[in-house]
Amino acid sequence: MVKLRWMNGEYMKSMDFDKFYEMAEPYIREVIKKNLDLRKIAAMVKTRIEVFPDIAGHIDFFEELPEYDPQMYVHKKMKSTEETSLKVLKDVLPILEAQEDFSNDALYERLSAYISETGVKTGFVMWPIRTAVSGKQMTPAGATEIMEVLGKEESLERIRKGIELLEK
């Protein structure tokens, strides 16, 4: 059974995107009721699932931010703690509030500039942002890709909630 799932996953990875989307869309619509770009969400999960029912567990956070433990901000490899994550989120919030173009590329470029200015590693900044906007440790995409799909207002609201959670 494990090998069959793996083979199916390989088949899905090689599948033409339009065909994949046509087959995945009903599974995505079961979870996502908001007006989000479902094609972008499908592209995120295409290489990460083995069977279509797996989609729900990968994308549920787009519909609603789950409750999560502030310990999720702690990541040994990224060298992030609750304290450093709080500082990063407080630093990037006004930057993102001022950001007009909320496309993945523009967000990544702006956050990369912040990373260069502060002299920290990319993961040190992106880990807390991704945690705040998704409420998960594992996501089908990075922080800026997720924010592009969520949009500016929802992304900022989730970052504010992350700050509140870390300040408790």
Segments predicted by a language model, with ranges:
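Short helix-capping/linker segments at secondary-structure and domain boundaries
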Residues: 13-17, 53-56, 135-142
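Non-catalytic, well-ordered alpha-helical scaffold segments
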Residues: 1-5, 18, 39, 43, ...
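Non-catalytic terminal extensions that flank enzyme cores
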Residues: 1-33, 145-168
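Charged substrate- and nucleic-acid-binding regions of tRNA-handling and nucleotidyl-transfer enzymes
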Residues: 104-167
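Small-residue-rich helix-loop
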Residues: 17-118
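Core structural elements
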Residues: 1-10, 50, 120, 131-136
